[in-house]
């Protein structure tokens, strides 16, 4: 199986989200699966313009904006699993992921043109990896619900969200429990594919 991972933390290599994502990826790859990772803070991704150019072609993204989303569209169309990996800021994902989510749902769901078309995402699966400062049930719950609705709309199977709490910059983030839970989450995901 193949995964497309959208990693979205401004802290890049120092990111707690990346630490968890790497455990997920190591487990995923150890099971013989492939993954392509995009670090969205290192890319150029403009927000959707709602121009609906994408709705004129029901077989391809056909987005009027040509930036790094072109490579992401291609990777997602070739993947079985989409992974959103973002810290939670203000109870939702970081801004580059939100821009990518908007572009994905419009360019790949052909529901908004003169004639209704298919979802090019149909049959794919999605999971998310997050870190947040609050307990996950209060810090990641709104993002989790947003993903459920995004997936239902796009006809994507939502496999769940892994959230780990960051207790503060003066406290080491990665614990054996977080590492074990991240590995178990990855195993659960590929068993449910």
Question: Which stretches of residues belong to each language-model region?
Answer:
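A short small-residue
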Residues: 2-5, 127-128, 162-169
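Short, glycine-/small-residue-rich phosphate/pyrophosphate-handling segment
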Residues: 112-157
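A generic structural signal for alpha->beta connector loops
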Residues: 32-34, 60, 123, 155-158
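Glycine-rich phosphate/pyrophosphate-binding loop and the adjoining helix
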Residues: 137-138, 145-193
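Short histidine/acidic/glycine/proline-rich micro-motifs that form metal-
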Residues: 10-13, 88-91, 133-137, 167-170
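Cofactor-binding loop segments of dinucleotide-utilizing enzymes, especially the Rossmann-like FAD-
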Residues: 8-9, 40, 131-133, 163
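N-terminal beta1-alpha1-beta2 submodule of the flavodoxin-like/Rossmannoid cofactor-binding fold
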Residues: 1-86, 90-109, 113, 176-193
């Amino acid at each position: 199986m193949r995964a497309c991972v959208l990693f979205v933390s401004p802290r890049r290599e120092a990111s707690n989200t990346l630490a968890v994502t790497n455990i997920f990826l190591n487990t995923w790859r150890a099971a013989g699966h492939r993954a392509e990772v995009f670090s969205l803070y290192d890319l150029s991704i403009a927000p959707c313009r709602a121009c609906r150019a994408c709705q004129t072609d029901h077989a391809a993204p056909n987005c009027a904006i040509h930036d790094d989303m072109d490579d992401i569209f291609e990777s997602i169309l070739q993947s079985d699993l989409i992974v959103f990996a973002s810290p939670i800021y203000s109870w939702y994902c970081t801004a580059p992921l939100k821009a990518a989510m908007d572009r994905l749902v419009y360019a790949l769901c052909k529901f908004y043109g003169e004639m209704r078309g298919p979802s090019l995402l149909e049959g794919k699966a999605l999971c998310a990896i997050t870190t947040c400062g609050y307990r996950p049930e209060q810090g990641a719950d709104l993002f989790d619900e947003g993903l459920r609705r995004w997936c239902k709309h796009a006809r994507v199977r939502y496999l769940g969200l892994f959230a780990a709490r960051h207790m503060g910059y003066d406290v080491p983030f990665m614990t054996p429990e977080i590492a074990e839970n991240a590995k178990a989450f990855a195993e659960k995901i590929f068993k449910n594919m």
